[in-house]
């Protein structure tokens, strides 16, 4: 369950950013979850709640923004949207693709008080 380590890293980063700016509480956190990130939002929400206990992030609302996967096709020189790994380019049918976005998990916004 790699979601626990991801949740803990998000908690640490959010708490650190809040403290550096003179705030004591994180009230909400927005996470962008790429469709190829292999992260289950329900699982990370569960882990987040458990790992946040006793921290400045405890009780913070967790919001998810989903990001589609996009790749650059070397055959047709276009950026295309993909729905699954190993998929051929929807424009030309080629398989020379490099994922450009949608394979990560990142914090996009932090609300503090």
Curated annotation (Swiss-Prot):
GO BP terms in the entry: protein maturation; protein modification process
Source organism, top-level taxon: Bacteria
Keyword vocabulary terms for this entry: Metal-binding, Nickel, Zinc
Record keyword S-adenosyl-L-methionine present: no
HAMAP family in UniProt: HypA_HybF (MF_00213)
Function statement: Involved in the maturation of [NiFe] hydrogenases. Required for nickel insertion into the metal center of the hydrogenase.
Protein name in UniProt: Hydrogenase maturation factor HypA
Gene (UniProt): hypA
């Amino acid at each position: 369950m790699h979601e626990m380590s991801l949740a803990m890293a998000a908690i640490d980063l959010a708490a650190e950013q809040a403290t550096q700016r003179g705030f004591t509480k994180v009230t909400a956190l927005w996470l962008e979850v790429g469709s190829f990130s292999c992260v289950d939002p329900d699982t990370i929400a569960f882990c987040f709640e458990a790992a946040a206990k006793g921290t400045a992030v405890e009780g913070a609302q967790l919001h998810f923004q989903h990001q589609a996967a996009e790749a650059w096709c070397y055959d047709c020189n276009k950026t295309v949207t993909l729905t699954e790994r190993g998929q051929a380019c929807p424009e030309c049918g080629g398989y020379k693709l490099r994922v450009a976005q949608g394979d990560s998990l990142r914090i996009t916004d932090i609300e503090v008080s």
